[in-house]
Amino acid sequence: MHLFILAAAALLGLSAAQHNPHTKHGRTAMVHLFEWRWADIAAECERFLAPSGYAGVQISPPHENIVINSPWRPWWERYQPTSYNLCSRSGNEHELRDMISRCNNVGVNIYVDAVVNHMCGASGGEGSHSVCGSWFSANRKEFPTIPFTHWDFNDHKCRTGSGNIENYGDADQVRDCRLVGLLDLAMEKDYVRGKVADYLNKLIDMGVAGFRVDACKHMWPGDLSAVYGRMHNLNTTWFSGGSRPFVFQEVIDLGGEPITSREYFHLGRVTEFKYGAKLGTIFRKWNGEKLSYTKSWGEGWGFMPEGNALVFVDNHDNQRGHGAGGASIVTFWDPKLHKMAVAYMLAHPYGVARVMSSFRWDRHFVNGKDQNDWMGPPSHGNGVTKPVPINSDQTCGDGWVCEHRWRQIKNMAVFRNVVNGQPHANWWDNQSNQVAFGRGNRGFIVFNNDDWNLDVTLNTGMPGGAYCDVISGQKDGGGCTGKLIQVGGDGRAHFKISNRDEDTFVAIHAESKL
């Protein structure tokens, strides 16, 4: 019995450690460089992410995937593995290793999007139409490069007529049947667990800091626990001995289904999809929502416990209307609202925060649905992903949006670092859509999302002095390229924000003091 208790405590310790993102140098926020090439991510870590205080990068799935030509090379083909070879349109294994090393060397962690619930779609055919030529047969459920055979899939367990998930009210179906026709791995099999763990461990040994685990709702927590338990500790070249991989699990839980996020809390952090969905309705002022209602933002809004949450305004799915949140999600297509919503997230202490970095595509709406939501990254005619060019004004070209480079978002990533560990404090609101709050005595932010001007004197909790607003500009030598905010010896400051300003919010922090 005593040994059992010790073993249970050890397992609990392992999973508790999997909630830690292992960020370095006081950095806090990660960015999802969606569909970027490994060579571009390596360069971005060195030239921009590290100097700007970003903590890490979520990368697109690095495994080999099926090539889909109809529609032409969609983004979602990356979520249909055909082998665990580290070869994708983002680059080969050598380029992946180079990126991981170069980012780690400047203190930027790499988190891998791990697709382990399934292989490609059942209708994927047979042949070598994988990104790097690996042969597979979706018809016969054979993936010899790994190898998986028909014995390694869940078809015998699924009890629906189609073999697909038909009813999200049935937890067995959601976990044992095919998600949109994708061949569902039998993760209760020790052999399958071993192959998945081998794939994750190869990446851990290369130096990644952890994983965003795709489609966790569709896997049994016990199976995931068994796989995570086989993961190696992080590479001691860059991480302290005994560090466990950071795990954040994609579970879409907006309520109303039998499977809940809570079932996965003990295994690592979980994506809080309610966060971006609610923040979107608040900033859009839909359904009578007001910014003033966010005084209790976080657990007070029915979100998961803070220590379990990975938060984001939008992600690669729901910015296209997939996943969760619907039309309320605020994306780069609404830049003014998006900057405000991301700033609110980065200023607020709840959760580990992730910033989205997107690519543009030609939207084509028919009856409210984007017919082009499948479109892949900017690419050449042969399907090869284009590099990310950096313009002279530090924005990106060729269809890459690079929200993480927008001044307002980049400077709020720094704000989050500066105020890290400080309590939410000095709340003010006008009972409508003007609010302000601080983080201890290290930072203060003011929002005006009303259709009229804000003109108010507030207690910032900050030491007296002149501060540079990091939204309209930033410190430049001894000066400031944006608004100057004067804080008196009593901590009070006067704020004026016109509802017609380019950005209707202001933020100051300890390191923006002149």
What are these regions (language model features)?
Residues 187-199:
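Alpha-helical scaffold elements lining the catalytic groove of polysaccharide deacetylases
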Residues 11-14, 18-29, 44-50, 54, ...:
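Active-site-proximal helices and loops of the catalytic beta/alpha 8
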